[in-house]
Structures are given as C-alpha cells and as structure tokens.
Amino acid sequence: MSLVTSATCVELLALRPRVYSATRPNGDFYLATQRHAESLGRPSAGAHTVLRCLADREHTHDELVAVAEEQDGDLGVEGVARLLGQLRAGGWLKITVTYQGRALHTLEPLRPPPPPSQEVCSAPVLSRFALLRRDDEGLLLESPRAWCDIRVHDPAVLSVLGSLADPEAGALPAEVAHRVIHDLCWARMAVPTPNTEDTELRLRQWSPHELWFHERSRMGTHAEFGNNYGGTFWARDRFDPLPARPEPFAGPALDLYRPDLAALRRTDPTLTTVLEDRRTIRVPDEDNPITAEQLGEFLYRCARNRGTVVDEGVEYTSRPYPSGGSTYELEVYPLVRHAAGLQPGLYHYESHEHRLRLVRAGSHPAVRRLLNSNVPFEQGPPQVLLVVSARVGRLMWKYEGMPYALVLKHVGVLYQTMYCVATAMGLAPCGLGAGDAEAFTQATGRDPLEECGVAEFALSSRPIEEPPNELARLSARTRQGPPKETP
C-alpha cells in the first residue's frame, strides 16, 4: 500500500543493505543487521520467494503479490500483505518513489519508522538539522533526527525542497510534490510551522553541528563496527601512515630540565591528595613567574614520549596519558608570555627529545592574538598558554567515523593529567573551553586539515594568597544577590 494514495507515483521495494537472514532449529526465520534482529515467524514458500526477490532487486507491490499468489494462491495475497507491513514497520524496506518511470527519491531506513501520517504537514519548512550532501552514489539528504536517509535521484525533488510551503511552485506536478513533501515530513527532514525544533529546550539546545557530531561519532543508526566505523585501517595500502614525529620547525632548540622520577615517587603528594586539592587558579604570581625548569618538569611528567615501537610500518608511542590505539596525535605548543629563563614566544614541545623549538617570536600578530583569545583572566593572559594541536592523520589513517571524537577524549585525559601534575608541583592550572584555531594556523603555518589547534591550557606560578575557588565565588555571588541598578 502506498504511503500517500496517488495514481501517478509508484513505489519500488527492496530490502535495505547489509541485512542478513537466519533460520533457527525450530523453523523461525529472522532478519538481522549487526545491531538488530526480528523474527518473521515461519514464512510460507511464497513469502520466502518474496524475501528473495526483495533481497535481489527492487519490485513493485503488484509484482510481489503475483509472486506470492503463484505459490500460495489466495493465501499468498494475504500473506504478502502481512509480510510487507511487518517489513515496513520494522524498517527493513527501502522505498523508491517513481513518477512516470523515473526515480524521484528513495527512503533508506536506519531504524524502524513511526507510523506514516495521512494528514498534510502544516506549512512545512526544512528542518534545521537536515543536510544535503554528495556521496559516492549521488545526493543524500540526512538528519540526525531522521529514521531514514533520503537518496535524491531527480533534480526536480530539489525544487520541492526550495518550495515546501507551495507544492505548485516546484518542477513536479502538485500531486507528486505532495508525495515528496509527505515523505520529507515523515522522515523529519521537514517540520511543520510552528515546530518543536524552536520551541522545545530538548531540541533548541542542540546546534545542528553538535547534534550531527554526537550522532555520527557514536554507534547507533549509522555507525556499525567495520562499516566505515571504528579501527578499520581504511587507508592501509592507499596512503602512508604519518610518522610519530611531526616535521620539525626551523627555529632554535632549547633542551629542557628532566626531573628525577625516582625521587618524585618518594616525595610527591598522594593521588588522593592531588585529586582533592585540584582546582582551577586564574590569578598568577607575577612577581615570581613560572620558571623554565618548572615548565620542563611539567612537560616531562605530562607529555614526553616514553618509547616508540613499529608494527606493520606504523609507529606507536607511549606517553604518561592514555591514547586510543597508542597513536598520540596531540602536540603541545607552549606560548610563553612571562617565564624566568625563557624568551616570550610560541614554542613547539618536541616530546621525543624533551626540548622546545621556537616557532614564532612573541611579537608576531598571530601569537599575540592566540595569547589573548577568549582568556578568562581578570589580570591578563597567563604566564604560559599551552596550545594543544592534533595531527589528525595519526588517528584518521586508522579510524573512521569516530577519530575526532577520540581527539576530544584525548584532550580530556591530557587536561586531567596536566591538572594533577600542576597541583602536585604547586602551580596554577586552568583548562580553557575555547580558543582560536585560525590564529594557531597563522602562527605555525601548519595545514589545518593535517594539524589543527584543538585545546588550550593555562599554566602560571601559584600565588601565595590564593583566590577563592569556583564554588566559593559562586556562593559569594549568590549571597550578594543581583547587582543593584544605579539610581
């Protein structure tokens, strides 16, 4: 049965890709994907033939009825109706809508759909989460809220997208355009006016790119291990893996202090002490700035390379913080403003050699911009701003669908490592929530598609008289109440 009664549109039905079948010893027949299975009971001979037809290629409803009727007689007609209804409801069928023999669009299910509505969508507009892009097969309309993707075959469908509120304005007859609009609304690619995307917090709080990133970097509707997701090593035999060491900068190098780890094991505060004493400190001691020796110890304890192994041509390393697949794509760039024993400027931390190499002088416009971007300090920028970048190819050569999410997880564990080490050393740490990626690119000259700025961490000397912690500041603000208006 067509979703919208129309004498001009014809549906072609087929099983969605990557669907498998299995029969249990008791005769129950199952359809399954990697993450979902459904029993179809014990299908008749005609139903089995219909399933084979659907797995082979697209068929019209009438063609499938004829196949079932030939084997099962009148019972086959009733049986195929039940079977197709179950397959539709379970999201097993992709549905191609045709007009005068030409394919308009295909609904490609990702999960079971909601029941189709026979009501017309009121003043529809394109969902703010919908995205039209090109893939290997053509144009694809997607949304993280949709139960299906919509494959666009005919350019006339695009004219309907541009005139959803006026079906007669597009390149298709109004009756056909209504079918396209119905499918867009059913798939949540289009929404009525007014719509919950603007009025409900649960939807309004998500920006399109954030919801897209969340939905596509987690397993679920699109992501299945081995199917363009996970550690697939997709680039093997196509591109060379990136080396563990990045291309060095041309500036002068400065060897850093190496602490005695054996002594630190004896004298450092306990893990519990560090975790309980950890706090964000934004006010530095400008009279007694951080020293080059302290920065050297900090970087050694947080981010040095502890060793490298090569496996099947890929270099894997080890650092004090964990990293997925031992890829260690993160690089640290200390931007020094005020540190005893160091000239102001942007440096790259060469973790394999434990040394700094000058990238740009502190007077460079991009370095100044980087230092002053979104810094939540009442008394100016920190003494050292640790800019963290990601050589994304270290991860993306192996992983699909999830590598940038891994980058952010790695930033998180590096932040915690930095907080703990700074606390143990008596320094003032502050993880920042935002930074200027373009300024990093301008300062370093790196290609942002190969290495991009992803995080910033402020590090300074700790003041003798420490400011109140965040909870104390918020509590004091609450007791004071809102600011009074000036009469």
Show the residue positions of the predicted features:
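Short proline/glycine-enriched turn/loop segments at secondary-structure junctions
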Residues: 442-449
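C-terminal helix-cap and adjacent tail motif
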Residues: 453-487
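Small-aliphatic-rich amphipathic alpha-helix that forms the alpha element of a beta-alpha
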Residues: 298, 332, 386, 392-394, ...
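A generic secondary-structure signal for well-formed alpha-helical elements
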Residues: 188, 302, 306-310, 422, ...
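Conserved hydrophobic/aromatic beta-strand scaffold that supports enzyme active sites
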Residues: 346-348, 385, 454-458
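A mid-sequence, solvent-exposed acidic-amphipathic segment
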Residues: 361-411
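Long, charge-rich, low-complexity alpha-helical segments
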Residues: 1-265, 276, 423, 474
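N-terminal amphipathic, basic helical "cap/leader" segment at the start of enzyme domains
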Residues: 205-207, 212-381, 479-487
